[in-house]
């Protein structure tokens, strides 16, 4: 459930920021997962 909860929060933040902010957040998250 923890992963699902984080996913929902991440999606909410992505929609909240939107635009360049959302892209930067997504890129940062991708770097964390890749690293």
UniProtKB/Swiss-Prot annotation:
Subcellular location: Cell inner membrane
Main localization of the protein described in the UniProt heading: membrane
GO CC annotations, alphabetized: plasma membrane
Keyword terms: Cell inner membrane, Cell membrane, Membrane, Transmembrane, Transmembrane helix
Residues spanning the signal sequence: none
Keyword Nucleus appears in the UniProt entry: no
Record-annotated membrane-spanning stretches: 6-26
Membrane topology according to the record: Single-pass membrane protein
Domain of life: Bacteria
InterPro entries registered for this protein in UniProt: UPF0387_membrane
Similarity section: Belongs to the UPF0387 family.
NCBIfam families membership: PRK13681.1
The protein's name in its UniProt record: UPF0387 membrane protein YohO
Organism phylogeny: Bacteria, Pseudomonadati, Pseudomonadota, Gammaproteobacteria, Enterobacterales
